[in-house]
UniProtKB/Swiss-Prot annotation:
Coiled-coil ranges from the UniProt annotation: none
Protein name as annotated: Isocitrate dehydrogenase [NADP]
Required cofactor names: Mn(2+); Mg(2+)
GO cellular component, one term: cytoplasm
Molecular function per GO: isocitrate dehydrogenase (NADP+) activity
Catalysis: reaction(s): D-threo-isocitrate + NADP(+) = 2-oxoglutarate + CO2 + NADPH
Gene source species: Naegleria fowleri
Cellular localization per UniProt: Cytoplasm
Additional note from the record: On the 2D-gel the determined pI of this protein is: 6.8, its MW is: 32.3 kDa.
Enzyme Commission number: 1.1.1.42
Amino acid sequence: AXFQKIKVANPVVELDGDEM
């Protein structure tokens, strides 16, 4: 998703992004 690129730069955001 979109959040995939953010997860690479900020691993902390992954829980608030695609994982949910």
